[in-house]
Amino acid sequence: TLNLVNGEIPPMRYGGNYKSYGPQYARGIQEGNGKPEDGNLWVTYSMNKEDIWISRIPVPVRTEAGSHAKEDFSRYARLADLTEWNIYSPLWAPVSLETEAGNTWLTLRDKDPFDYAKVERKIPASRQLTVSFDLMAGQNDHGTLQIEFLDADGIACSRIELTSEGILRAKGGSRFSNMMKYEPGKTYHIQAELSVKDRNIRISVDGRPVGQRMFYAPVAS
């Protein structure tokens, strides 16, 4: 199989001669240059002939998920311990583990005008799925957080958003449905129930149903 290390290409920050889109000049640790202490693959590349990236790929390389997610981030001492996650952490949009209000959070920040932080957790293919998690926003007057549910090909069927207007909303079809307002610094327990058979998502916040929306793309699982 051919597996992507990074398949998403950000806009070019600036133009120039002989510049091409996408990851280029990929390099690994060649024979004779030593062996990584962690035994993993380390690959570097240039994105759009601008930023230089370093990717750590856990060995053995796995393409299938063996179990569903049940994470307690307080169990991890550092971000590198989250080997079940795919983490995309630009310099100006870093992903980190931080302590806030007595809890350890997987934290996404962003001040990059051309790129954004991204974390992915692959799970076994499911036609019926219930996902629950705690969420806390650092602000509600700028920035956007998107939570998407994807199939095995990376096609998103549903999306929950925190908008820069302080609204939690869900995308259904070609439209968005506002569900509630959210406040910065407040912890919300979100539960999403997805059904491929019914082609919809039901969302609850702190045990209270806030909306139901149809998938905006057909998926098999």
Model-derived regions, located:
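Conserved blade-ending motifs and adjacent loop-strand segments that build the rim/top face
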Residues: 2-33
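Beta-strand-rich interaction surfaces with strong enrichment in secreted/lumenal proteins
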Residues: 15-16, 117-123, 176-182
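Blade-level signature of beta-propeller repeat domains, shared across WD40, Kelch, NHL, RCC1
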Residues: 23-67
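Extracellular glycan-recognition surfaces and repeat-rich motifs
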Residues: 77-105, 115
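Secretory/extracellular carbohydrate-interaction modules
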Residues: 100-172
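Short tryptophan-centered beta-strand motifs in secreted/extracellular beta-sheet-rich domains
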Residues: 131-133, 185-196, 201-203
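Short, aromatic/His-centered strand-loop micro-motif at the edge of beta-sheets
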Residues: 169-191
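Short, solvent-exposed beta-strand-to-loop segments that form ligand-recognition rims
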Residues: 204-220
